[in-house]
């Protein structure tokens, strides 16, 4: 009996197949600091530090930034050519995106007519209204659309149209193909130079006119600005410059900014004088003598305004005002206004150097006359036969208890303007007369002419002082007159 032997091969059932471990990539061999990036295949450095290996097939990226002019530090594969350009992976990606976007822009979208033709196939007519001819034409139209080839002419876009100069004299495109020297003339070198010179002179005059126009616009706008500022100042007053008291923080900041703007680029002192000289020299060099005269006249005009009209008088040297309006300059100290009188005030400027309180010629006070000529008084006959009461006695000349001697200098006789011969009151008895003469004056009448001759030379220089001292013994009741009535006196 034949036996069949079956050989059973051992199976791996129940055994765990070991998973092959993948070798971990080695890290970068950068020596300056540890780098955890994996090495490139066949290299010892990563893509970031591969340039440390001079034999590696890599070089620095050729991209240069347009902002700062620096070159990209990343590594890029070496090109086949020695002087070839190669970029890193990042800049290659950016170039691809930029190229793709540019292709999208250059490729025009579907034209409106093409879209209408494509959609017109869906516009079917109503059922029952189709005829064999219309159905035949519809079929032929569909076949025509299907046979549309890309090689046919595309519709013209706006960018592809001819751009001509609308102000040119050309009437058609064919004019560009004509001879440009068709209407040209034949000139010599001297004639060409003269023509070019005339053109340059004309161009220069046009530029000068344009510059003058700009200057006129600047002056006009400045005038409007000053007028508006004056109106605003009259309407609002000087409330902005009263001080930071009672203002909010924002208002204080605005006030500070306004003050800074007012003195922004404003020149002072020597700098202002030099700047003015520079402007005058520039205007003299550009515009000539006529402009110099105009500049001199305009710069020497007074800055004062009378009834909104500028004063046309010439200003004083080193000032901006004339002699009439010089007192409007608060910084000057050489002139003062005339005070005038109480009835008619006067504001005419007068130099301070003339006197401490200057006055104009109309209100000038004359000094007292230094020389007084001698006057021979004629005594009328009626005065010689006058009564004895006209003269005072020595007892009346003495100071009384009611009026002390210290107040005698302040007496002033009212009514001293009447014409009469000098009285013995004009002389001091204690100074000019002896004691016996005083007694004679008390008993007998005074010889007026004799006393005048005797005390003329000695008492004329002391007339004012003696008159004040002689009026001291007057009593409070007054001076006795010829009628026996007391004459009133006053204390000044």
Swiss-Prot record:
**Has keyword Kinase?**
no
Instruction: Tell me where in this chain the PTM Phosphoserine is found.
Output: 147, 149, 168, 172, 175
UniProt keywords, alphabetically: Chromatin regulator, Isopeptide bond, Mitochondrion, Nucleus, Phosphoprotein, Ubl conjugation
Q: Please state where this protein is localized.
A: Nucleus; Mitochondrion
Chain spans, region Disordered: 126-182, 455-492
Give the sites modified to Phosphothreonine. 131
Source domain of life is: Eukaryota
Residue segments, region Required for interaction with other NSL complex members: 308-364
Q: What is its main location?
A: nucleus
Amino acid composition bias (Basic and acidic residues), ranges on this chain: 135-144
* Compositional bias per record (Acidic residues), positions renumbered to this chain: 167-178
**This protein's GO CC annotations:** actin cytoskeleton; cytosol; histone acetyltransferase complex; mitochondrion; NSL complex; nucleoplasm; plasma membrane
The Gene Ontology biological process terms listed for this entry are: chromatin organization; positive regulation of DNA-templated transcription
Which Pfam families does the annotation name? Answer: zf-C3Hc3H
Question: Where is the cross-link described as Glycyl lysine isopeptide (Lys-Gly) (interchain with G-Cter in SUMO2)?
Answer: 78
Q: What does it do?
A: Non-catalytic component of the NSL histone acetyltransferase complex, a multiprotein complex that mediates histone H4 acetylation at 'Lys-5'- and 'Lys-8' (H4K5ac and H4K8ac) at transcription start sites and promotes transcription initiation. Required for NSL complex stability and for transcription of intraciliary transport genes in both ciliated and non-ciliated cells by regulating histone H4 acetylation at 'Lys-5'- and 'Lys-12' (H4K5ac and H4K12ac). This is necessary for cilium assembly in ciliated cells and for organization of the microtubule cytoskeleton in non-ciliated cells.
Assembly information from the UniProt record: Component of the NSL complex at least composed of KAT8/MOF, KANSL1, KANSL2, KANSL3, MCRS1, PHF20, OGT1/OGT, WDR5 and HCFC1.
Q: What is this protein called?
A: KAT8 regulatory NSL complex subunit 2
List the source organism: Homo sapiens (Human)
């Amino acid at each position: 009996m034949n036996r069949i032997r079956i050989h059973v091969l051992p199976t791996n059932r129940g055994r765990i197949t070991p998973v092959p471990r993948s070798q971990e990539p080695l890290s970068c061999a950068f020596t300056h600091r540890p780098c955890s990036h994996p090495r490139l295949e066949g290299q010892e450095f990563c893509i970031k530090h591969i340039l440390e290996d001079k034999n590696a097939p890599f070089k620095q990226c050729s991209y240069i930034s347009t902002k700062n002019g620096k070159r990209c530090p990343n590594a890029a594969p070496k090109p086949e050519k020695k002087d070839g350009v190669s970029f890193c992976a990042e800049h290659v990606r950016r170039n691809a995106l930029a190229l793709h976007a540019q292709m999208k822009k250059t490729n025009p979208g579907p034209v409106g007519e093409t879209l209408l033709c494509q959609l017109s196939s869906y516009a079917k007519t109503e059922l029952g209204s189709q005829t064999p001819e219309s159905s035949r034409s519809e079929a032929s139209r569909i076949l025509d659309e299907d046979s549309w080839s890309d090689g046919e002419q595309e519709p013209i876009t706006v960018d592809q149209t001819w751009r001509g100069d609308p102000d040119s004299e050309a009437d058609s495109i064919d004019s560009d193909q004509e001879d440009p020297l068709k209407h040209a003339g034949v000139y010599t070198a001297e004639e060409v130079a003269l023509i070019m010179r005339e053109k340059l002179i004309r161009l220069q005059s046009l530029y000068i006119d344009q510059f003058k126009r700009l200057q006129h616009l600047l002056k006009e706008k400045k005038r409007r600005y000053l007028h508006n500022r004056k109106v605003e100042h009259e309407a609002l007053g000087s409330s902005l410059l009263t001080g930071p008291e009672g203002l909010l923080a924002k208002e204080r900041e605005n006030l500070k900014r306004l003050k800074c703007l007012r003195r922004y680029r404003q020149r002072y002192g020597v700098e202002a004088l030099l700047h003015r000289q520079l402007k005058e020299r520039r205007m003299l060099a550009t515009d000539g003598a006529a402009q110099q005269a105009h500049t001199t006249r305009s710069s020497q005009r007074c800055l004062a305004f009378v009834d909104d009209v500028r004063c046309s008088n010439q200003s004083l040297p080193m000032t901006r005002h004339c002699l009439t309006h010089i007192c409007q300059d608060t910084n000057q100290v050489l002139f003062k206004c005339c005070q005038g009188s109480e009835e008619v005030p006067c504001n005419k400027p007068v130099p301070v150097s003339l006197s401490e309180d200057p006055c104009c010629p109309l209100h000038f006070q004359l000094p007292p006359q230094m020389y007084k000529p001698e006057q021979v008084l004629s005594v009328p006959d009626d005065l010689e036969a006058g009564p004895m009461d006209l003269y005072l006695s020595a007892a009346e000349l003495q100071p009384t208890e009611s009026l002390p001697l210290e107040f005698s200098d302040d007496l002033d006789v009212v009514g001293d303007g009447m014409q009469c011969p000098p009285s013995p009151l004009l002389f001091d008895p204690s100074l000019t007369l002896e004691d016996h003469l005083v007694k004679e004056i008390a008993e007998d009448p005074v010889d007026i002419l004799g006393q005048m001759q005797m005390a003329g030379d000695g008492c004329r220089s002391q007339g004012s002082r003696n008159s004040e001292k002689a009026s001291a013994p007057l009593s409070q009741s007054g001076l006795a007159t010829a009628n026996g009535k007391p004459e009133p006196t006053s204390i000044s």
